[in-house]
Amino acid sequence: VGKFPLLANSR
């Protein structure tokens, strides 16, 4: 993760 911190946190 890093490019998509928001997406990873959304799960």
From Swiss-Prot:
Q: Which domain of life is it from?
A: Eukaryota
EC assignment: 1.8.1.4
Q: What class of enzyme is it?
A: oxidoreductase
Give the reaction(s) catalysed.
N(6)-[(R)-dihydrolipoyl]-L-lysyl-[protein] + NAD(+) = N(6)-[(R)-lipoyl]-L-lysyl-[protein] + NADH + H(+)
Cofactor(s) needed by this chain: FAD
Function field: Lipoamide dehydrogenase is a component of the glycine cleavage system as well as of the alpha-ketoacid dehydrogenase complexes. The pyruvate dehydrogenase complex contains multiple copies of three enzymatic components: pyruvate dehydrogenase (E1), dihydrolipoamide acetyltransferase (E2) and lipoamide dehydrogenase (E3).
What the record says about family reads: Belongs to the class-I pyridine nucleotide-disulfide oxidoreductase family.
Query: What is the additional note?
Result: The active site is a redox-active disulfide bond.
Partners and quaternary state? Answer: Homodimer.
Q: What is this protein called?
A: Dihydrolipoyl dehydrogenase
Native organism is Populus euphratica
**Lineage of source species:** Eukaryota, Viridiplantae, Streptophyta, Embryophyta, Tracheophyta
